[in-house]
């Protein structure tokens, strides 16, 4: 099969990219052909044969005028939609595998995939791997960053709670944009065009199923890892955390739970 991997970053920038690159390596080893679409960056290590990428959006280092321009582009990215069409026409994929697309590529590319599929009478499947909770929580963490408490107020499509709580970086403006983005694409029912949503845990699947747009299309599939030969060593029992030191990762909760474990 021909598989088009879609992600905003096409270079090692975090766990999502590690997943994409490892999965792609495995797919290629099984005889499949893989190409990629995302933002242009000088550090990109994968790509597509037609050389089509969308402009890089850097919220943190952007000038004021660019931030104004980005405020529209993060909801509907016309350039991304135009550029992915070039890749679709050239590569002719059998499967488009979406990953982190929101706020940079935006779900506008799904509309172009559907249009291309219909115009060319293609049976191309669309798969969406969820690396966070963005489709059901505009700040993507299901956690209020101001109180550091878990939060599920937006579940079921109640995205106005993001604005009420200023849940995106404590900013009313950013939270408003996130709320608008969520309502816009849910009301357009663009996600009905996705065949399967892959959730990295049963918990995530349960939360995704709280929205009728996703219910019936979700599957729980744990992230994979390479197996290694176990070494027999003498050691005490311990708990290992492997990941980024960040508040939303739940390290405080892990520490508190460990305190309750028997010695």
Ranges and model annotations:
Residues 9-11, 224, 242-246:
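Short donor-sugar binding/catalytic loops of nucleotide-sugar-dependent glycosyltransferases
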Residues 198, 231-249, 255-260:
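Conserved donor-binding/catalytic core segment of Leloir-type glycosyltransferases
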Residues 2, 217, 235-239:
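Charged active-site motifs of nucleotide-sugar-dependent glycosyltransferases
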Residues 30-95:
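A conserved catalytic-core segment of Leloir-type glycosyltransferases
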């Amino acid at each position: 099969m021909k598989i088009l991997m879609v992600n905003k970053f096409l270079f090692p920038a975090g766990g999502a990219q590690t997943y994409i690159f490892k999965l792609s390596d495995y797919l290629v080893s099984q005889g499949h052909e893989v190409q990629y679409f995302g933002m242009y960056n000088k550090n990109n290590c994968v790509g597509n044969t037609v050389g089509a990428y969308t402009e890089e959006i850097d919220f943190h280092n952007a000038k004021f005028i660019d931030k104004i321009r980005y405020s529209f582009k993060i909801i509907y990215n016309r350039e991304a939609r135009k550029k992915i069409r070039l890749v679709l026409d050239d590569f002719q994929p059998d499967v488009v595998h979406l990953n982190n697309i929101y706020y940079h590529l935006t779900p506008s590319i799904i509309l172009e995939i559907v249009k291309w599929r219909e115009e060319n009478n293609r049976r191309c499947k669309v798969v969406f791997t969820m690396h966070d909770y963005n489709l059901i929580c505009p700040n993507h963490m299901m956690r209020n960053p101001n109180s550091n408490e878990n939060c599920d107020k937006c579940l079921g499509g109640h995205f106005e709670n993001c604005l009420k709580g200023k849940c995106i970086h404590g900013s009313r403006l950013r939270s408003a944009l996130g709320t608008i983005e969520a309502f816009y694409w849910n009301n357009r029912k663009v996600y009905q065009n996705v065949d399967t949503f892959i959730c990295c845990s049963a918990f995530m699947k349960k939360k995704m199923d709280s929205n009728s747009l996703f219910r019936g299309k979700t599957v729980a599939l744990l992230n994979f890892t390479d197996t290694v030969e176990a070494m027999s060593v003498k050691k005490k029992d311990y708990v290992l955390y492997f990941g980024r030191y960040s508040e939303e990762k739940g390290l405080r909760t892990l520490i508190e739970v460990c305190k309750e474990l028997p010695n």
